[in-house]
Amino acid sequence: MNISYGITVCNEADELNKLLEILIHKTDKEDEIVICVDGDDDAVRFELDSFTQKYFDKKTIKVYQRTLDKDFAAQKNSVIENCRGDYIFHIDADEYPHKILISQIKQVLEMNEVDLVWIPRVNTVEGITDEHCAKWGWRINDKGWINYPDYQARVFKRSKDIKWIKPVHEYITGCKTYAHLPAQEELSLYHPKTIEKQEKQNEFYSTI
């Protein structure tokens, strides 16, 4: 079994660096990393050039450019089209997986013959206030995690029937069977943000 780790990135060089450091060193040699780049950011290009040159003989890293054009589903579907793995693990550039999640995901897939695995996600927003939470209907636990386990449809079979739909707040279709990982930190994605980035994203989403 091999997995394609599909990443969408836009002007997130520091976040991409952290994510790639984990994927390069914790995934298997037969796995690949597929990166869809929106925009023309020099810092992102520098990170990608650095990783592809340093690890070209150890890891298959595919990079291509595509304009988002206010359609997140189309962007993610383009990632699917560029993947060759048996399964696809989609990760946004500002997320990163717990290392134990990466080490156990193939065992999970072997034990659960399903089309889709839902992954819990740890969301944190630096600078968030009670007023923000009330405004957006969010809840925060005693660890500062927002809406946990906030399950995400991220690991799925590569199939012509499985795709993303809706330009914003996109969701996946075509999966007939699925499983949820336990709501445990070591099996989660991390999604850290600042309140400034969150508000900027909310404003952008409202234009789509």
Where would I find each of the regions flagged by the language model?
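Catalytic-site signature of metal-activated, phosphate-bearing donor transferases
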Residues: 73-80, 87, 96-208
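N-proximal low-complexity "stem/linker" segments adjacent to membrane-targeting elements
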Residues: 1-25
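A short acidic, amphipathic alpha-helical/loop segment
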Residues: 18-22, 47, 78, 103-105
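Conserved acidic residues
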Residues: 31, 61, 84-86, 94, ...
